[in-house]
Curated annotation (Swiss-Prot):
Domain 5'-3' exonuclease: 162-257
Protein name from the UniProt record: Flap endonuclease Xni
Keywords tagged on the record: DNA-binding, Endonuclease, Hydrolase, Magnesium, Metal-binding, Nuclease, Potassium
UniProt xrefs under InterPro entries: 5-3_exonucl_a-hlix_arch_N, 5-3_exonuclease, 5-3_exonuclease_C_sf, DNA_polI_H3TH, FEN, HhH2, PIN-like_dom_sf, Xni
């Protein structure tokens, strides 16, 4: 069975970079990233590995909602200047790169879903909880910095909703980290309570007459914003990748069933 290790490039690199005392020390960054990737390969023993990078284009989410991710700090200049050399070094280690046009998240999600649908296993290396919406038994998420898989049960308990409701929760309450707005006046706790009662957004919005006047008014006025927020939070899983899987095979890994990535 194919086991694809899919690394969220800047999620890994920027966290390692932040821990380096001298921000111009690209040699130290390269050594630490190389060590991290070597450890990932040793721990998970995948048949395939790729590291996915964000691109420079304006994402469709930003075009849809200009405030999306507004206020994010730009990449530090030394890192921006040294990134190509780091990517080349990883290529020399036989860790191939995939370059997204804009956000890496949709490419990672698409690759994971395609792998799972082809009866393979996908392991996403990232601390981004947004990948938790990929509800498939053949997809898991690994936090390299805490050396553990994402605990979905613990996340469900923390958020107060089931995994299948994660997107509905973000549609109602928003996501401050990504500047996804949600509905004004609806916080995470009240959103979770609403979803416990009504289970889904369609049922909730068709049942506003069962709520108090004040809350019903907030929801009615914010319905379109909830739809927008849902769309912003939802990962695309059907992008054309135009890659050849054999280019990402781990050296010395035995041949396995081919995944159609077209």
């Amino acid at each position: 069975m194919n086991k694809f290790l899919i690394i969220d490039g800047l999620n890994l690199v920027r966290r390692i970079y932040a821990a380096i005392p001298d921000e111009t020390d690209m040699q130290s960054l390269t050594e630490r990233v190389s060590s991290a990737c070597t450890k990932l390969l040793r721990v998970h023993r995948p048949t395939h590995v790729a590291i996915v990078w964000d691109g420079d284009e304006i994402s469709w989410r930003k075009q849809l909602y200009p405030n999306y991710k507004k206020g994010r700090k730009p990449m530090p200049e030394p890192l921006a200047q040294g990134l190509v050399a780091l990517q080349d070094h990883l290529t020399a280690m036989h860790i191939g790169s995939i370059y997204a046009a804009a956000e890496a998240d949709d490419v990672i999600a698409t690759l994971a879903i395609k792998t799972a649908k082809a009866q393979g296993e996908a392991i996403i290396v990232s601390t981004d909880k947004g990948f938790s919406q990929l509800n498939h038994r053949q997809i898991s998420q690994w936090d390299h910095f805490n050396q553990q898989y994402l605990d979905i049960a613990a996340l469900e308990q923390k958020l107060g909703v089931e995994r299948s409701q994660f997107l509905d929760l973000m549609a109602l309450a928003g996501d401050s980290g990504n500047k996804i707005p949600g509905i004004a006046g609806i916080g995470p706790k009240s959103a979770a309570e609403l979803l416990k009662t009504f289970r889904s957004l369609p049922t909730l919005f068709s049942s506003l007459s069962n709520l108090g006047a004040k809350q019903a008014k907030k929801l009615a006025e914010g319905k379109e914003m909830a739809r927008l927020s849902y769309k912003l939070a939802q990962l695309q899983t059907d992008l054309p990748l135009n890659i050849n899987l054999k280019d990402f095979r781990v050296i010395d890994s035995p041949p396995e069933k081919t995944i159609n990535q077209d």
